[in-house]
Amino acid sequence: MEEKITYKNAGVDTEKGREFIQKIKRNVESTHGPRVIGGLGGFAGAYDVSVLKKYKHPILLSGTDGVGTKIELARLLKIYNTIGIDLVAMCVNDILVCGGEPLFFLDYIACGKLDPEKMDQIVSGIVQGCKMSNASLLGGETAEHPGTMKEDEFDLAGFVVGAVEKDSMIDGSTIRSGDKILGLESSGPHSNGFSLIRKLLLKEGKYLPTDPQQVKFLKDYALKPTRIYVSSILKLLQQVSVKGMVHITGGGYQENVPRILPQGTQSKFFKEKIPSGYFFEKIKKDHKIEELELFATFNMGIGYMVIVSEENAELAKKIMESSGEVVHEIGEIVSGNKEEVQFV
């Protein structure tokens, strides 16, 4: 008997998709406050923007990002409950640089074949990240890509919308020579540099090492979720005038720090003040990589930077430490070409 032609036989199981939505519904809706109108499953997510009345002149901020090839490490290790935190962190930390308060978040998940248990773990991480950011998970899309992705492969993208008072928006324009750079410690490599990490730490860049200790190192240090700085920074902004901020992502220091600097200023970092930590020290020790290449690829122990005047540096440090951050004065602003980053 000839097989019946169906969408399911082509590789897309819509019934399993509906079951998945029901499975995650309660968890997702736990991020919803009174601002979210309606529940999960509609054609659009609805958000009550009357919250913007607290601003004199509200500016909306938006951001989108993914987690790169860190996903491949999560897939190999079969650990799926933290990669969603990474996804939220990469987005909310970016709009935070402008002083933005996250309002709502959306996600996109593409997979070769829908595995409800795996996807539930991924979404649970996204929910956790949203709660840490005080953002509502307003909606999302999960798409099966049979024939174009392997069954156990998946990819993630996130989208965030936030708000900031126009007069309080931070753009780096007031940064001057003599200002101090405060660095907030990262949890590890966060979500950047994983193509190099996989090349260095995986067999042929594709397979888990056979040594259990090396696998443990990957689990304990490389896969640790990206730190979310939202609550600490928003608390700081209420008390101290901040001139500029930097989220250290792809391209490390050399790509990210110049983005916030005005012409005629330059960042100068004191290498001995940067707490690279065990993960980066081991990478440096075990592999012959030039130090400047490490700073151009990784966060080297500092996930987020705050630039303040010299007179505000100590107070800003204390406020962030009171929020649980580990903070170091890692550099200063000097005169020079903004595109050149000094390490001394």
Curated annotation (Swiss-Prot):
It is an enzyme of class 6 (ligase). GO terms for molecular function: ATP binding; phosphoribosylamine-glycine ligase activity; phosphoribosylformylglycinamidine cyclo-ligase activity. It is found in: Cytoplasm. Pfam families: AIRS, AIRS_C. Its main location: cytoplasm. GO terms for biological process: 'de novo' IMP biosynthetic process; adenine biosynthetic process; purine nucleotide biosynthetic process. Pathway: Purine metabolism; IMP biosynthesis via de novo pathway; 5-amino-1-(5-phospho-D-ribosyl)imidazole from N(2)-formyl-N(1)-(5-phospho-D-ribosyl)glycinamide: step 2/2. GO terms for cellular component: cytosol. Its EC number is 6.3.3.1. Keywords: ATP-binding, Cytoplasm, Ligase, Nucleotide-binding, Purine biosynthesis. Belongs to the AIR synthase family. PANTHER family: TRIFUNCTIONAL PURINE BIOSYNTHETIC PROTEIN ADENOSINE-3 (PTHR10520:SF12), TRIFUNCTIONAL PURINE BIOSYNTHETIC PROTEIN ADENOSINE-3-RELATED (PTHR10520). This is Phosphoribosylformylglycinamidine cyclo-ligase. The lineage of its organism: Bacteria, Pseudomonadati, Spirochaetota, Spirochaetia, Leptospirales.
